[in-house]
């Protein structure tokens, strides 16, 4: 593996921590006041778009499920409510089985480890710091940048070709 791969980029929720279900439940709770039919559409959209920024999901839900545009202030308020619902549960989430061992093996092999996540950057940094994971990763990146942009940036700055990144 180390002959060809020179770096590994991870998603975070559901890859490092068992936090994907926490976020699904936060979406459900956020839209519960709109009734079961709306909640099921929200859940389905969220699950079909894991790893995508929650703010993009909020805008899609407002337009396609609730039938109205979503202003910046409303989007920010939803983001704050979502974080309040999910943050403590994410901080308490267990590691995905095998994640800690895989990270340790990669560290021993000297392979740089990065995170590219759909979680907002400030929130992701807080989670990584509070879980003591900062030393595990060379860099941690979240939204508003999207994953393809993050990957291009990491590869350019670290002089990595696409076939050298897992």
Question: Which positions does each model-derived feature cover?
Answer:
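Short polybasic/polar patches that bind polyanions
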Residues: 32, 63-64, 107, 129, ...
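Short, solvent-exposed coil/turn linker segments
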Residues: 1, 50-53, 146, 161
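Alpha-helix N-cap/helix-start capping motif
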Residues: 20-21, 52, 100, 118-121, ...
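N-terminal helical cap/lid subdomain that shapes the substrate entry/recognition surface
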Residues: 3-97
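Short, acidic loop-to-helix structural element flanking the phosphoryl-transfer center
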Residues: 4, 84-115, 121-125, 148-149
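Substrate-recognition "cap/lid" segment bordering the active-site pocket of phosphatases
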Residues: 92, 114, 120-166
């Amino acid at each position: 593996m180390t002959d060809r791969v020179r770096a590994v980029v991870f998603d975070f929720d559901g890859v490092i921590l068992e936090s994907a279900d926490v976020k699904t439940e936060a979406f459900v709770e956020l839209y519960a006041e709109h009734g079961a039919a709306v909640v099921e559409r929200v859940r389905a959209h969220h699950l079909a778009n894991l790893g995508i920024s929650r703010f993009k999901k909020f805008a899609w839900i407002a337009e396609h499920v609730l039938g109205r545009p979503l202003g910046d202030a409303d989007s920010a308020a939803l983001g704050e409510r979502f974080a309040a619902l999910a943050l403590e549960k994410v901080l308490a989430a267990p590691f995905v089985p095998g994640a800690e061992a895989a990270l340790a093996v990669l560290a021993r092999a000297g392979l740089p480890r990065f995170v590219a996540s759909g979680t907002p950057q400030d929130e992701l940094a807080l989670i990584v710091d509070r879980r003591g994971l900062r030393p595990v990763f060379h860099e941690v990146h979240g939204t508003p940048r999207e994953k393809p942009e993050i990957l291009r940036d990491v590869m350019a700055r670290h002089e990595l070709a696409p076939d050298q990144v897992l």
